[in-house]
Each structure stands twice: as C-alpha cells, then as structure tokens.
Amino acid sequence: MERIKELRNLMSQSRTREILTKTTVDHMAIIKKYTSGRQEKNPSLRMKWMMAMKYPITADKRITEMVPERNEQGQTLWSKMXDAGSDRVMVSPLAVTWWNRNGPVTSTVHYPKVYKTYFDKVERLKHGTFGPVHFRNQVKIRRRVDINPGHADLSAKEAQDVIMEVVFPNEVGARILTSESQLTITKEKKEELQDCKISPLMVAYMLERELVRKTRFLPVAGGTSSVYIEVLHLTQGTCWEQMYTPGGEVRNDDIDQSLIIAARNIVRRAAVSADPLASLLEMCHSTQIGGTRMVDILRQNPTEEQAVDICKAAMGLRISSSFSFGGFTFKRTSGSSIKREEEVLTGNLQTLKIRVHEGYEEFTMVGKRATAILRKATRRLVQLIVSGRDEQSIAEAIIVAMVFSQEDCMIKAVRGDLNFVNRANQRLNPMHQLLRHFQKDAKVLFQNWGIEHIDNVMGMVGVLPDMTPSTEMSMRGIRVSKMGVDEYSSTERVVVSIDRFLRVRDQRGNVLLSPEEVSETHGTERLTITYSSSMMWEINGPESVLVNTYQWIIRNWETVKIQWSQNPTMLYNKMEFEPFQSLVPKAIRGQYSGFVRTLFQQMRDVLGTFDTTQIIKLLPFAAAPPKQSRMQFSSLTVNVRGSGMRILVRGNSPVFNYNKTTKRLTILGKDAGTLIEDPDESTSGVESAVLRGFLILGKEDRRYGPALSINELSNLAKGEKANVLIGQGDVVLVMKRKRDSSILTDSQTATKRIRMAIN
C-alpha cells in the first residue's frame, strides 16, 4: 500500500511522466540487444564507424615485415599498438591499397579455372545482344527454373564427394566415386587445380556452382533456360521487357533440350512396336546424348516433360504427381473425386464409354503458352480463368478444359464420327478422341457452350465464342485474366507404375501420362544424339535404314555367318531386320523372302557356292514371312530416294556395290565398311593355313556344341575338340594339337581331310 502511494506521488509530478515516456529507461535491454550473439545487428552502421577510425583492420604480425611503416606520401600504414585480445596488429585501410599496388604477385593461372562460372558469364554477356525495350503488361508466371548456367548434373551428395576428393583429399571419411561423370570431373579438376593457392573453401564453393543444378521458383515471362534466367533482372520488369539474345549456349541447357527431343523420338517409336515398354527400355539404354548414356542423364536430370517422364517411369524412377492432358500439366489443388464408367452419346449418336470423375475438384493448368485455374463438378465446368500469350493459346486452353470437364454439351457438339488413331493405328481412348476432334475445329463447341452476362471484375474480361474479348458477356463460366497461374512449385516426386503400352499411373491408379500426351513438335537437337538401337534407324529416313542394316550385318558377320548355316530361322527373326521391311514394296515382300530363303538353302546344300557378298546383300530380304512361289528374280526393289531402286541378285548396283580389290562396301554411294570375305571363297586351300595347329577329325559332331568361327578357335585348350565353320558355310570337327612340332604338316593334310570330311 505504501509503495502504491509513493508511486502515485511520483506520478503527480510532471517531470516523472516525461522521463518515463520520453527517455529510454531500460538501457540494459538495448545494450543486450546490440551486444549479445555474434550476429551483427546493424552492419552498415558498424562498417561506417569502424572505417572512420584510423586503424580499423587487424592483420597477422607478419604484415610488419611485408609492408613498410609509411607509404610514399608519408602516411602511417600500421600502428605499433597491438590489438587488444589477440596477437594481431592494427592496420590502416591505406595498407590494403599499398598491398594491392606493391604486394607480391602470385600466379593467376588458377583464377579462370576456379572462377570458371564467372568468366564464362562475362563472355556470354560480352557476346550477347540486347535489343529494344518494350513497355507492355507482363504476364509472368512462377516456374521452377535453373539459375546456374554451365553446371554438370550431379546430385548434392555426388558433388559433395567430388569436392571433398578434389579440395580436401587427405580428410578422413569414406568417399565413393561411382558414376562415370564423378570420376571424369574429379580427375579433370585435380589436374587443373594442382598447386592452387586460392583458399580451399572458396574453391569448394565455386566447384559446387559448377557441379550442382540450382533451381528457384521465379516469376518468368519468356525464356526459361538458364542463360536467360541469369539476366532476368535485365530483361523483364513489371511493365517492360528488353529483348536479349544470349552470347553462347551452356551444356546444361543443351542437355535439357536434347534430352526432350531424344525422349520424344523414343516414345513415339516405342509406341508403334510390338512391345512398347520393352522397346522403350532397350532404346533408352542404348542411346547416348552428347557422349553420355541417356539413362545416366535421366537419373540425374530433373527436367519435367511428358516424354522424359514416361522414360523415367519405365526406369522405375520417381516423377512429379501432376498429370498431363492435351499438352497441359494439371495439378489438383483441392477437392476429390471417384471414377465411374459411363456411356454417353455424341451429337452423331456414336456411343462413347468414358470414365467420369464424380465430385468437386479444382486444378491449375499450366501449358507452354497459356495457364488457367479450373473448378469443376461432376460433368460440369464451374469456372475457368485463363491467361495466355495470344488468342490462339487461350483458345487451346479453353478447348482442353471443356473436354476435361466432360460436360454433355461438349459431347453433343461432336459432328461426324470419332475414329482417330495413334501412330500404331490403334483407336485413341474416348477422351483423346474428343480432344483431337475439337482441336481440329472448335466452332460448334464454342457456339453450343452457352453465354452469360458478367459482372465487372478488375483484371478479368469475358470471351465470346469467336474468341473476341467483351466486358458484358462471356462463354458460360469462362473468363480471361491478365494474371498468369503459377506452375506447381513442389519438387516432390512419387512412385509410379507403367504398363506395357506406356501408360503411367500413380499408386491410386490415376493415369498421369500416356504416349498420346507426347508432343508432336520436332526440333533439332543441340547435342549429338546417337541411337544405337535398330528401332531408331528410321529416324533419318530410308537411306539411313539401308546403310545401318548392312553395317550391322558386317559388324556382326562372324556370328551372323554361323547362324546363317545352323539356325537361319532365328537369324531371319532378328529385330535388326525389322526397319528394312518398310523399304520393300508390300505386295512382293513375301515372294522376295521365299526366293532368297530357297537360294540360301541351295548354297547350304551345294558345296562351293557359299558367297559372302551375296548372303549379306540378300539377307535382309529373307526376314519377311515367306510366300512359297516358283518366282525367280534377277533384281530386288527397295524404296529409297522417293522411288524404287534395284539391288541386283548377282553383281553390283548403285544401291549395293562391293569392290573386290579394296574390300569396301558402298551403299547408295556411302561407305558402309570393310567386308572381309571368307578366305578366297573359290578355293578351299587357304582354310588349311588357318587350321594349322588343328587336326581335322571328320564331319560335324553335334555333341561338341555349336560351330565356332575360325577366329574363336584360338580359345580352345590343347586336345580339346570343337565344330568349326569354314569358308563355304561347311562345318567340320577339329581337335587342337597337343604338340606344336607337327603343325607344319597340317597344311598339307588339312586340305585332303576337309574334302574327305565334307564329302
């Protein structure tokens, strides 16, 4: 009570009130605020008052031996006073100037190597061209972009191991460098940075920039590759944009771009083969992009594109949980639905079986040139807010949303029959049938959709069936907005499954991707894509198929030859001959095949008629299912260069030309490699030389396994027996001699014995 009275008394004095309200009372709290913790609370102020002092810097004692006490102007560079609390010296900023001008010069050779990303950036900017500035409304949408040009694509963990190995090789800790790229980079960097005096920490930071992809979720209108993102602040503002052409490409952008092209080509090709999934995997594993295996790139590269994601799903990698329809990426932001099969009638009274999504859901739709927010109920579009670069792009988004809504008026707007097929000539599923139909012509769809009066809402306008904007009326539920819809920002990846026909589903069975979603756009890859798979020979046209088929036979001639004589059917069914069939006129394929197979059988039966060049030349024709006929051919036709060209059964032609003296084979004038004929096929004498050191025992004996080629004989142990294939496609049984002394006589006896064994 006493205290309260005392306080009241104090408060009655005007001075007390002033002290309490106007002056800082608890100095301790403020002092604490600015002195506790190592974090500087007001860095710029601190810098200013420190630099106002005479000796604001502390330096190692050695500085006194390396820097004079005064400079040329007589100003003191360091103080004799020791720094309180450490054994360092107090130094003036002038000492730094002196050091920069007169200090020792170390080697600069490592700077461009360590700071490579900066030097490269300067070069790109130097050679880049900046165009005019345009003032206009910018529709920016946030996208996940790569902010770090010129990086490799290592994971954070892989990069960490490389950095530790390069910068701190003697530190303890297990480092496992497994991938091809890790080993190459480590070796390269160790050589580059020998005797490097730059601080290891700095080197580590810079290496990280070079090795790891850094992404940010940034508002972008325009180019999204890293060489555009590095100048984002120069090329687009809120109401202006400046044209810019980068002064150089970087490998990471090239890889992203080439990966998309390779993946699209592979998915398109796999979709039309007998077993799409197996074919896709075979192609992914045998393709290289810029010299790196495609599967390695897929494992490391986070690019999200329909074809790339299908390839990743096939390899068992996780992908984004968003799904694709009509070239737009859909991400459900709220609501849920259950699926039910329903039969609907089109305007042409065709019955379609569609999977209806029952329930209220909201989605974001993000495409290349347009974005939208879609709210839908069961078979009803509630609202669609679209923004896009131009009328065309906005129309594309509206069509996709209308089809996706599964509304009845959309299905009734179909005129004519729906019979679209995919590349493999299979009918598309109903949703894609509808989509294709309206993408061709959406006039009826827009006319029948219905129109409503609209309220005036800032930043939104209506759009009429002819795609003209309006402030009074709009197609029902549809508005065009100035603002873009951001891409889905999460980098979360989910486990998915893929079926034989390349349909990718999430764990709840929703289809996320299918080959129908893969873009038909064809670009030119910036890095060389090498498809080793025979399935991709067609990509460069008929000539490439022809050359590749014959090159394949020549490269594998040793094994092909054995199969030709022992297991021809297996040889004819090889997938490498599949592309060739498209060059042979359909009507006559079967007859050609029957004719060639009969010819080959005669060669096997009649001694001395084995002819390497002829077998190679005619082999691809034998791959088609044969038709039995008595027809004989002197030439076979292939469709290349837009017309039928002839391959002569006996002799050379412009399509297939073998030069006996140079042993070179040219296909359509292109070199297809060296063809080593079996040692002088007209006489059997040369075989004897090859079979030196072997005793010929007689005819082929199946118990000793399949026939080896002459080259494979060297692997036999002394005394071991084997069947061997000799020049004319004949097989004999031989034994490797136990003693080398008798080798000389082999040549003479071999010739006699071969003849006896065969006859």
Swiss-Prot record:
A GO molecular-function descriptor: RNA-directed RNA polymerase activity
Compartments where found: Virion; Host nucleus; Host mitochondrion
GO biological process per UniProt: 7-methylguanosine mRNA capping; cap snatching; DNA-templated transcription; symbiont-mediated suppression of host cytoplasmic pattern recognition receptor signaling pathway via inhibition of MAVS activity; symbiont-mediated suppression of host gene expression; symbiont-mediated suppression of host mRNA transcription via inhibition of RNA polymerase II activity; viral RNA genome replication
TM helices/strands, residue ranges: none
Principal subcellular localization: virion
SUPFAM superfamilies cross-referenced by the UniProt entry: PB2 C-terminal domain-like
Site description Mammalian adaptation, residues in chain: K627
Keywords: Cap snatching, Eukaryotic host gene expression shutoff by virus, Eukaryotic host transcription shutoff by virus, Host gene expression shutoff by virus, Host mitochondrion, Host nucleus, Host-virus interaction, Inhibition of host innate immune response by virus, Inhibition of host MAVS by virus, Inhibition of host RLR pathway by virus, Inhibition of host RNA polymerase II by virus, mRNA capping, mRNA processing, Viral immunoevasion, Viral transcription, Virion
Motif Nuclear localization signal per UniProt: ranges: 736-739
Pfam families named in the record: Flu_PB2_1st (PF20947), Flu_PB2_2nd (PF20948), Flu_PB2_3rd (PF20949), Flu_PB2_4th (PF20950), Flu_PB2_5th (PF00604), Flu_PB2_6th (PF20951), Flu_PB2_7th (PF20952)
GO CC annotations, alphabetized: host cell mitochondrion; host cell nucleus; virion component
Chain's role: Plays an essential role in transcription initiation and cap-stealing mechanism, in which cellular capped pre-mRNAs are used to generate primers for viral transcription. Recognizes and binds the 7-methylguanosine-containing cap of the target pre-RNA which is subsequently cleaved after 10-13 nucleotides by the viral protein PA. Plays a role in the initiation of the viral genome replication and modulates the activity of the ribonucleoprotein (RNP) complex.
HAMAP family membership: INV_PB2
Description of how the protein assembles with itself and partners: Influenza RNA polymerase is composed of three subunits: PB1, PB2 and PA. Interacts (via N-terminus) with PB1 (via C-terminus). Interacts with nucleoprotein NP (via N-terminus). Interacts (via N-terminus) with host MAVS (via N-terminus); this interaction inhibits host innate immune response.
Family membership noted in the UniProt record: Belongs to the influenza viruses PB2 family.
Name under which the protein is recorded: Polymerase basic protein 2
Organism: Influenza A virus (strain A/Beijing/39/1975 H3N2)
